[in-house]
Amino acid sequence: MSMLCYTLIIAFLIGIWAAPKSEDNVPLGSPATSDLSDTSCAQTHEGLKTSRNTDQRHPAPKKAEDQELGSAANIIVDPKLFQKRRFQSPRVLFSTQPPPLSRDEQSVEFLDNEDTLNRNIRAKRENHPVHNQGEHSVCDSVSDWVIKTTATDIRGNMVTVMVDINRNNEVYKQYFFETKCRNPNPNPVQSERRGIDSRLWNSYCTTTQTFVRALTMEGNQASWRFIRIDTACVCVIIRKTDNF
């Protein structure tokens, strides 16, 4: 009886030892572990390839600032456009920085060399009603360098004015020197002008315009056009009676 028990116990232990091991208990370096590692690596590699293909098909959107800088840098202007002196105007200036006004606000002076596109300019614009002692302007005016994005051309059409200009891999801005009335008031009753006899005349100040050549966009090409800019403040008088 005891021999039979020993035989059954030994057979039971042999059966347990010979049973197949689970994948969780497989030691490292065994064939089963290698198969699992190869399978997971292959799946990971396929996932990386899929994500790369997705990124190539759907690139990340660019920021608005990057798009604006890129569009400004892509507008390349042929340097030959600046070789003709008849296109130059003292009221139009291309510069990498805002042009300075003089300290007394009575003249405008900008000086630079030819290598930086800014031609030598020495222009004076009146900005104060007092020219000399005893001389006064009928209307007060103010002048300043401005940047324009749109303007009216000589044909009366609205055109796009170039702001940033790429020349020789350097970006310049197009500035316009404008003069306008300081306090325009078309109502002659509310405001009188210097030296105008209000008993005989109605008067008011108004800003006048003239045409200058500026670089504008025509499709994808840069071209010179005549555009309107403010250039002076004048006094308009109207006779009240026709007695004379």
From Swiss-Prot:
Function: Nerve growth factor is important for the development and maintenance of the sympathetic and sensory nervous systems. It stimulates division and differentiation of sympathetic and embryonic sensory neurons as well as basal forebrain cholinergic neurons in the brain. Its relevance in the snake venom is not clear. However, it has been shown to inhibit metalloproteinase-dependent proteolysis of platelet glycoprotein Ib alpha, suggesting a metalloproteinase inhibition to prevent metalloprotease autodigestion and/or protection against prey proteases.
Protein name, UniProt field: Venom nerve growth factor 2
Principal location: secreted
Region described as Disordered: spans on this chain: 47-69
Protein family: Belongs to the NGF-beta family.
Signal peptide range in chain numbering: 1-18
Organs and tissues of expression: Expressed by the venom gland.
Annotated propeptide span(s): 19-125
Entry keyword annotation includes Glycosyltransferase: no
Disulfide pairings: C139-C205, C181-C233
Regions of compositional bias (Basic and acidic residues) in chain numbering: 47-66
Keywords for this protein: Cleavage on pair of basic residues, Disulfide bond, Growth factor, Lipid-binding, Metalloenzyme inhibitor, Metalloprotease inhibitor, Protease inhibitor, Secreted, Signal, Toxin
GO biological process annotation, one example: cell surface receptor protein tyrosine kinase signaling pathway
Subunit structure as annotated in this protein's UniProt entry: Homodimer; non-covalently linked.
Gene Ontology molecular function terms on file: growth factor activity; lipid binding; metalloendopeptidase inhibitor activity; nerve growth factor receptor binding; toxin activity
Highest taxon in the source lineage: Eukaryota
UniProt xrefs under SMART domains: NGF (SM00140)
GO annotations of cellular component type: axon; dendrite; extracellular space; synaptic vesicle
Location of this chain's protein in the cell: Secreted
